[in-house]
Amino acid sequence: MIAENNQGPTSKKAHTKVFNSFQTKLTVFFTALFLLLQGAAFLTVREAIVQNIFDQSRDQLVAANRIFATRIQATVNALAEGAQILASDFGFRTAVATNDKATILSALNNLGARISADRVILVNLDYAITADTGNPDALVTDFPFYDLIDRAEEEDRAESFTVLDGIIYEFVVVPVLAPVPIAWIAIGVEIDREFADDFRNESTLPLDVTFATGRDEDGWAATVSTLPTAAQSDLPGALAAKGAMLGREPETLVLDDGDYVTLVERLQTPTESVSVNAVL
């Protein structure tokens, strides 16, 4: 006997429909899987690229920090050398001993002009300013950074960043000896936009530099910067947001015009001065 075949046209259509539905689902599944794998691969590659950029930026910042330290030390040495030459000059020591203010001020101005210093101050043994090229007509006032004088007395020289009259200076203090100390010379260069531009231009690395005052509970102020104006305005808030995380390791800061890999170097300041930081 031969069995009768009951599959008609309707049954074949249903079979084809099921097959097509399964094929569609399979296609969608593999397409989704492919896109998922592609997305995961893209994110992995992107993360690797970002990490590589960060690592390169970190290495560049570490190198820039060494260049910065070398530049600062060279400035300190030049200031100290000039101050020590004046301090050992017999005529100058005589003027100091006799309190000849006109001669003292003239000598301080000549020294500043000769070594491109922006401010030269003579401080007596009572920490009082007796002559100041930055404020020549001022009445006698105390030199605000006792710590610098005390360190210079112990070590024959002291250097530090300070904020004086709202301006950042790099100061060097040396004694005037006859043969014991009879006064102190504080000689400084202003850390201004020209100083920051010179450092950036001398660097072989593409970087910006900001000198920021304050920190932590004092709040931040971007006093001098090579950053664009909008980014400079954003910087204090971005630094404050990082808070205690800011240290010797680079951090990423989000500013107006993009992300910056940043290294914050806390510079040496006297105990009486607001803190000064170099933000590279």
Describe the predicted segments one by one.
Residues R119-I121, V174, V209, P250-E251, ...:
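Generic short beta-strand
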Residues V120-Y127, L207-E217:
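Short hydrophobic alpha-helical segments used for membrane anchoring or interfacial signaling
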